[in-house]
UniProtKB/Swiss-Prot annotation:
The active site is at D166, H331. Residues 159-358 form the NodB homology domain. Disruption phenotype: Decreases chitosan levels during growth in host tissue. Attenuates virulence in a mouse intranasal infection model; decreases fungal burden in mouse lung. Triple knockout of CDA1, CDA2 and CDA3 results in an absence of cell wall chitosan, melanization of surrounding media, an increase in capsule size, sensitivity to cell wall (sodium dodecyl sulfate), osmotic (NaCl) and heat stress, and avirulence in a mouse intranasal infection model. Its EC number is 3.5.1.41. It is found in: Secreted, Cell wall; Cell membrane. Acetate binds at D166, Y257. It comes from the Eukaryota. It is a lipid-anchor; GPI-anchor. Induction: Induced during host infection. Induced by the antifungal agent caspofungin. Hydrolyzes the N-acetamido groups of N-acetyl-D-glucosamine residues in chitin to form chitosan and acetate. Chitosan is required to anchor melanin to the cell wall, for maintenance of cell wall integrity, and for proper cytokinesis. Plays a major role in synthesizing cell wall chitosan during host infection; chitosan offers an advantage during infection as it is less readily detected than chitin by host immunosurveillance mechanisms. This is Chitin deacetylase 1.
Amino acid sequence: MFTFAAFSALLISLAGVVAQTTGTSVDSSILTKTADSTGPSGFSIPALSELTSGAPTDSTVALYSTFAAGATPTVSGAPVLPTSALTIADYPALDVTPPTNSSLVKDWMAKIDLSKVPSYNVTTGDCSTDAAAISDGRCWWTCGGCTRETDIVECPDKNVWGLSYDDGPSPFTPLLIDYLQEKNIKTTFFVVGSRVLSRPEMLQTEYMSGHQISIHTWSHPALTTLTNEEIVAELGWTMKVIKDTLGVTPNTFRPPYGDIDDRVRAIAAQMGLTPVIWTSYTDGSTTVNFDTNDWHISGGTATGASSYETFEKILTEYAPKLDTGFITLEHDIYQQSVDLAVGYILPQVLANGTYQLKSIINCLGKDTSEAYIETSSNQTTTQITAATGSQSTFFQPIVGTATGAEVSAPSEATGSTAAGSAASTTSGSGASASTGAASNTSSSGSGRSATMGGALIALAAVAVGMVYVA
């Protein structure tokens, strides 16, 4: 488990790394920029220079609409909204990994064939102290940006932007929802289970408005630091609270901080979930994550102005070099990030006219109904071959989001302890790996962009990102 003490040590050790990937120094012309949008209902968006960690709290806005129990969704084949309200006592405590000894988690675990899950150790979440996890071929995104062919990391068509927001619903989400509704923009919301339990009506409005809902775990941990049982609990409870709220279950998830490896992938596959990360672009020795850094503003390591400048570089320097579309990382958990989106980023994209804004499921060329297990036309049973021997393989589910088939994964490190044990740790030395069907350097013949996240940027994401505000 990634403790606060461990996070503090990691943050201190990575102070130099963070300084390289985020900052508050920007072109002076950006500091004078004012909002291109007043927001829905004349809501006043602060000047860009005022979007800082010390910004005064905005007044919140109401949802443009709420929906009654039994209302019919726009998603083809979906059931009506559930008629029973959520009972908080029926769910785990907020913002902590759920207990693994509950009957539900035991039932979910019973459906997981652990012989088909690579027995890699849990990681420390820290690349500087976990060399063994880097070198054992597990395809750990956090340390090197490794992805598998079945990870969703881009939109196939050039100039299509897969828009997404993480960590909500929050008190500031209604402003974003209202703006998206006003402009007829669809996005993907990667929601935290604890936030859904706190604000189910916001999730229903997102869903009923045609946005894609996806999973972002129950308490926002770095998944590779968890045991198998804890991963199942984090994903399973989030799947359950979403279905209890909407009547459908997402078939995609985004690992917090992008922290994923083949063990997490294999467990998620057996739960019917396909991972979605964000696009990276590699040009020579430079690797850029399509991360606006809006989540750094609240912590003071970025400002609205510096995040906007990052966004402009993505849009003007890196996206045009791709043969494909792209997926970005943005957030609706913070006031500043929502103000940045509604007042600056989205209005500029609309005014520019170059990029088509779509939810991720739509940017893949699929109907929104393909985003949910119950309504997807692709009900292929997940097939996973045994994760043992020199050529272990796993199959990533393709329910609604088919991008590939069986993917070869290298065998686990010799003598490793099964990650199902809470006491599992790793140690040793080694260099970053590039094996199997992993992608961490360049595009394939299909024109796919490079998917190396970049160890420095990813490390900073794990470090600073642990300051998670509920």
